[in-house]
Amino acid sequence: MANTQLKSDAIMDMMKEHLSTDAGKEVTEKIGLVYQINIAPKKLGFEEVTYIVDLKKGEVTKGKYEGGKVDATFSFKDDDFVKVATGKMNPQMAFIRGAMKIKGSLSAAQKFTPDIFPKPSKL
């Protein structure tokens, strides 16, 4: 079951495209951090898929980060990540409700806002 198809996979693909646009380049210049996002199909900590959202280089990759240490790590269930990425749930609310776990720099985590995702019209 490690090859589970996540709804988040499509969002990450769109994000990869988004970061190559002018709007995406603005995000990269503004934030300049590296985030690790762990997405679990059903339960946090189980069968998680790891994505690296590199807002220094403007890249999204699947798997572990090869460039040292990430600035912050976020863990979500698939459905909760989709809600945050599409603007249906605010990241702060997700954290308060326990739908998102954070490790790493708090100042880096505070820059994890809906602005980094493609606009909902594309989702």
Swiss-Prot record:
Tissue: Expressed in most tissues including seedlings, cotyledons, inflorescence, leaves, stems, roots, siliques and flower buds, with the highest levels in floral tissues and in maturing seeds.
Keywords attached to this entry: Lipid transport, Peroxisome, Transport
SUPFAM superfamilies registered for this protein in UniProt: SCP-like
Primary site of residence: other
InterPro entries listed in its UniProt record: SCP2_sterol-bd_dom, SCP2_sterol-bd_dom_sf
UniProt induction comment: Accumulates at higher levels in dark-grown seedlings. Induced by sucrose.
Subcellular location per the Swiss-Prot or TrEMBL entry: Peroxisome
Motif (Microbody targeting signal): 121-123
Cellular component, GO annotation: peroxisome
Gene3D superfamilies in UniProt: SCP2 sterol-binding domain
Domain SCP2: start-end pairs: 16-113
Record has Transport as a keyword: yes
Function comment: Enhances the transfer of lipids between membranes in vitro. Active on phosphatidylcholine (PC), 1-palmitoyl 2-oleoyl phosphatidylcholine (POPC) and ergosterol, and, to a lower extent, dimyristoyl phosphatidic acid, stigmasterol, desmosterol, beta-sitosterol and steryl glucoside. Inactive or poorly active on palmitic acid, stearoyl-coenzyme A, cholesterol, glucosylceramide and ceramide. Required during seeds and seedlings development.
Protein name, as recorded: Sterol carrier protein 2
